[in-house]
């Protein structure tokens, strides 16, 4: 099951007390955390769970983000998949199928976790209802999309000491995608070539949306 690339575009936090800043304050705090990040790279471990908590799929890889609008998300195991945004187009590459899907970086694609993290934080209050929860060194933000044209029903971002450590998203069926980040580097130098994609010779190209 190759659900990862379509999921893009991702327990204890639910028990944390809800802060008084549930809407505008939570959005402003999250925007401030995201605006302080110009680039972000990390290893990741992803698990997809069904509504009962049964693990359906696990994957691992590396990701790079550069704001605004650029990212490179690469699954290394159990099989390689690559998703790259150059700020104008999004490329989804499946080496096993020798297939590349190319689509514009439009509103629909922006409503995904990767583009949310790499895009403009100012759009948060317009597009999402935001609630915040706080622990000792941990902050968790729950985002509920205001538009139905999204890939998730809710998205949780978890920060520890003001650094993004993980995210969890849930779709309309109750299926959850949980992503934990490790070996994190914030605002480091990332080679610009990470955010370019050259279509491999002989690959089948599917262009969507112009």
Swiss-Prot record:
Q: State the UniProt keywords alphabetically.
A: Chaperone, Periplasm, Protein transport, Signal, Transport
Q: Where in the cell is it found?
A: Periplasm
| GO CC annotation | outer membrane-bounded periplasmic space
Q: What coarse category fits the chief subcellular location reported for this protein?
A: periplasm
The record's annotation in NCBIfam families points to:
lolA
- What subunit structure does UniProt give? Monomer.
Q: State what protein this is by name.
A: Outer-membrane lipoprotein carrier protein
């Amino acid at each position: 099951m190759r659900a990862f690339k379509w999921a893009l575009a991702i327990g204890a936090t639910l028990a944390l007390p809800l802060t008084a800043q549930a809407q505008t304050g939570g959005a402003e705090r999250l925007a401030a955390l995201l605006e302080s990040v110009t680039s972000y790279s990390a290893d990741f471990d992803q698990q997809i769970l069904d509504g009962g908590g049964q693990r359906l799929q696990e994957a691992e890889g590396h990701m790079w983000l550069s704001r605004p609008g650029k990212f490179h998300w690469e699954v290394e195991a159990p099989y390689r998949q690559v998703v790259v945004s150059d700020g104008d187009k999004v490329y989804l590459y499946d080496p096993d199928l020798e297939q590349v899907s190319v689509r514009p970086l439009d509103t629909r694609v922006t409503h995904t976790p990767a583009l949310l993290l790499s895009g403009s934080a100012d759009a948060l209050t317009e597009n999402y209802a935001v609630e915040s929860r706080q622990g000792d060194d941990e902050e968790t933000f729950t985002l509920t999309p205001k538009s139905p044209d999204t890939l998730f029903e809710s998205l949780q971002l978890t920060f520890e000491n003001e650094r993004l450590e993980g995210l969890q998203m849930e779709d309309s069926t109750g299926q959850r995608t949980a992503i934990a980040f490790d070996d994190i580097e914030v605002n480091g130098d990332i080679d610009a070539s990470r955010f370019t994609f050259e279509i491999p010779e002989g690959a089948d190209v599917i262009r969507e949306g112009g």
